[in-house]
A protein has these predicted regions:
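Non-catalytic substrate-recognition/targeting regions of SAM-dependent transferases
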Residues: 105-118, 134-196
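Non-catalytic accessory regions of SAM-dependent methyltransferases
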Residues: 1-121, 171-174
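A short interface-forming secondary-structure element
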Residues: 121-134
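Short clusters of small/polar residues that mark proteolytic maturation junctions
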Residues: 45, 55, 129, 188-189
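Short amphipathic alpha-helical segments
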Residues: 74-81, 132-140
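Short, surface-exposed beta-strand-loop junctions and turns on beta-sheet-rich folds
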Residues: 49, 58, 132-134, 192-193
Length: 196
């Protein structure tokens, strides 16, 4: 597995030892030239030891950590992370007979920094807040419909996309959801944030 490497400045490993999912640009001493925003990189200590894998960005938050272990960031990775999030929501009885709208992915809390995914019945709304997640949109959308049985369509509502578009499936721009037995009309194409 050969990926570009970014190197931490001496002494900056401590923060990552506490599993903080962000690496700020000031913590890096060396970045391989010509890295694209959103590219998957390995993070190494100043001694050359592997620490993490993440999405690189030429912004203040230079790396958003995806994994603390050496592994491929591929379809099985996205399925695994989404499956873990789905399993956690299932323990909270989501979805249920009185609620079919919930947040499936809440960024760093679900070990997917820079990503929000809300489920509204059979539609999932994808919202990337980091270039790496936007670059991975199609793979993530495909993994969503594979791991969340009720979802048949995924729409992209990321801030950095020109217009909302369907990543998987298609549908109307709005629908009715249930939250604690109450019905709400949600417009996931023009509504605020992800629609609700």
């Amino acid at each position: 597995m050969s990926r570009p490497v970014v190197t931490l400045a001496k002494g900056k490993e401590r923060t990552l030892g506490r599993r903080h999912p962000w690496i700020f640009s000031g913590a890096l001493t060396r970045v391989e030239a010509e890295l694209l925003d959103g590219e998957v990189v390995d993070v190494h200590t100043s001694r050359g030891e592997f620490v993490a894998i993440g999405h690189y960005n030429r912004a203040s938050i230079a790396v958003r950590v995806l994994s603390w272990q050496q592994r491929a960031i591929d379809h099985s990775f996205w399925r695994e992370r989404l499956g873990e999030a789905r399993a956690l929501r299932t323990t909270l009885a989501l979805p249920g007979t009185e609620t079919n709208a919930y947040r499936l992915i809440c960024g760093e809390g679900d070990q997917l920094p820079g990503l929000i995914v809300d489920v509204y019945g059979s539609v999932a709304v994808f919202q990337a807040h980091a270039p790496g997640m936007l670059r991975s949109a199609q793979a993530i959308a495909e993994a969503i419909v594979e791991t969340v049985p009720e979802v048949t369509a995924v729409i992209d509502r990321s801030k950095d996309t020109e217009s909302a578009g369907w990543l998987v499936g298609s549908g109307e721009g709005e629908g009715v959801i249930l939250e604690h037995g109450h019905s709400f009309r949600v417009n996931w194409q023009r509504g605020q944030k992800t629609g609700f």
